[in-house]
Amino acid sequence: KLGETYQIKICQTYTNKSNLDAVNFFWKLMKINESPESFLIRDKDYNIISCSPETLLEKKKNIIVTKPIAGTLNRTKKMTSKFAKDFFQKNEKESKEHNMIVDMERNDLSRICKTGTVKINKLKTVEKYRDLYHYVTKIRGSLKKNISNHDIISAMMPGGSVIGCPKISTLNLLNSREKINRNIYTGSFGYINANGDMRF
């Protein structure tokens, strides 16, 4: 129905049989697509490889931070960060989509953070990678008392940058239109320390 979603990230599934060694494949991928949140999980029955640059959530004590990415520009050798920032700011589509994701992530944080503590630290900054520029905003908040790690994960996952917004109605639309469950794809990987700090 009209108005059920403002932005939707529909995905397709591609499969291919291969005898490639997972470790070699991972390192080859890193050479052409360096990302700070990359990982390789090896198991007896499967391997999982990811090269995402995004920090969905980071919790230290009672402070939680999210850094949504919404906006990507191929980088050339002569291109500068200033050029990339000007491009994102002047591109109406990129700017509006970024604003929508930021608003949604602020809303997610407000469910688990103290009133008035959800703040934007860095709005619409440009992060430089080997072949890309990303449009990134950093948002932080102070957690309410008695908020569990389960509460945090439930509020923040999945991230808005991989589904669209608003979250619930867009997820329902994706579930009805995508033929195969995403499973691990566009999921989150991270850790929870013994003291409760976490990063995904």
What is the role of each PLM region?
Residues K1-F200:
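Extended alpha-helical targeting/anchoring segments
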